[in-house]
């Protein structure tokens, strides 16, 4: 089975080699969310320009970006002397009036391509991805910095189709050595408005509907329980006050009756008459 880097390189080939190459979107294995609203990740041209014969000298690869349109579909990136264009993002209105140079990187010899088997190593994952991929639209500050030096790779426009081209430049002569075809149109993602989001419950799972229903009705039941607890506490307090008042009334009515009627009745009936009769009897004896 051929190494994975060979598979990636062959994925960028179209109809042969040399000028018949096209830049391709990065594999979903390495860039799951691609393109985004403002960025596009591409596979670097590994083993493309030097696949048939080794190159001698120092070379760089320039990446050009162009907004897709009928008038600029086959736009040139070099002048009549084969000198590569140095147009910037600002000069071309973000690629709308012509291609601009978004990035430049050294050409990695085919024999020095890093092994993708090491991508499982977390410490080397970023290094390997940078060796195989290039992302367009990652610099969000270069347009705002008046002192910025170098290539400006600002965010792309959302919902816009772009084309991309790799150009091989011989750094000794400063001339174009080779180049790919323009890529097929690649469209950046579109911002989804909140009003366009489908919230119909029919597209939700049964579990989501049950959980949503429970959470929605839970505050209602809590409110009912709280109100019931308040009513019960008020009823219990009223019963306790009524019982205390009833006991105090019974006590107040019972005490005067026992002190005011029993004792005087007992004294007047049992003791009063017997004392009067004894006094009368004693006076008669003295006479």
From Swiss-Prot:
Membrane topology: Single-pass type I membrane protein
InterPro entries reported in the protein's UniProt record: Uroplakin-3, Uroplakin-3a
Residue intervals annotated with topology Lumenal: 19-207
Region of interest (Disordered), residue spans: 243-274
Signal peptide: 1-18
Example GO molecular function: structural molecule activity
Cytoplasmic topological segments: 236-287
Protein localization: Endoplasmic reticulum membrane
GO biological process, one term: kidney development
Keywords: Endoplasmic reticulum, Glycoprotein, Membrane, Signal, Transmembrane, Transmembrane helix
Residues bearing attached sugar chains per UniProt: 74, 139, 170
PANTHER family: UROPLAKIN III (PTHR15446), UROPLAKIN-3A (PTHR15446:SF17)
Protein name: Uroplakin-3a
């Amino acid at each position: 089975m051929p190494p994975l880097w060979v598979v990636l390189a062959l994925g960028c080939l179209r109809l042969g080699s040399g000028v018949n190459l096209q830049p391709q979107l990065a594999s979903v294995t390495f860039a799951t969310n691609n393109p985004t609203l403002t960025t596009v990740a591409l596979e670097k041209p590994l083993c493309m320009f030097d696949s048939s014969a080794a190159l001698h000298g120092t070379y760089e690869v320039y990446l050009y970006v162009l907004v897709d349109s009928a008038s600029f579909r086959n736009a040139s990136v070099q002048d009549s002397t084969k000198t590569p264009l140095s147009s910037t993002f600002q000069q071309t209105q973000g690629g709308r009036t012509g291609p601009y140079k978004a990035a430049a990187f050294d050409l990695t010899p085919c024999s020095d391509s890093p092994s993708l088997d090491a991508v499982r190593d977390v410490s080397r994952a970023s290094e390997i991805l940078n060796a195989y991929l290039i992302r367009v639209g990652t610099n969000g500050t270069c347009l705002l910095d008046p002192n910025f030096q170098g290539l400006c790779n600002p965010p792309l426009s959302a919902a816009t189709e772009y084309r991309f081209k790799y150009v091989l430049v011989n750094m000794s002569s400063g001339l174009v050595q080779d180049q790919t075809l323009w890529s097929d149109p690649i469209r950046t993602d579109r911002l989804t408005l909140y009003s366009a989001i489908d919230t119909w419950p029919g597209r939700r799972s049964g579990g989501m509907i049950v959980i949503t229903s429970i959470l929605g009705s839970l505050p209602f039941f809590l409110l009912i329980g709280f109100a019931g607890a308040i009513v019960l506490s008020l009823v219990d307090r009223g019963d306790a006050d009524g019982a205390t008042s009833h006991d105090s009334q019974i006590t107040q009515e019972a005490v005067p009756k026992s002190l005011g009627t029993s004792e005087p009745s007992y004294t007047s009936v049992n003791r009063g008459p017997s004392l009067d009769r004894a006094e009368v009897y004693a006076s008669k004896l003295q006479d």
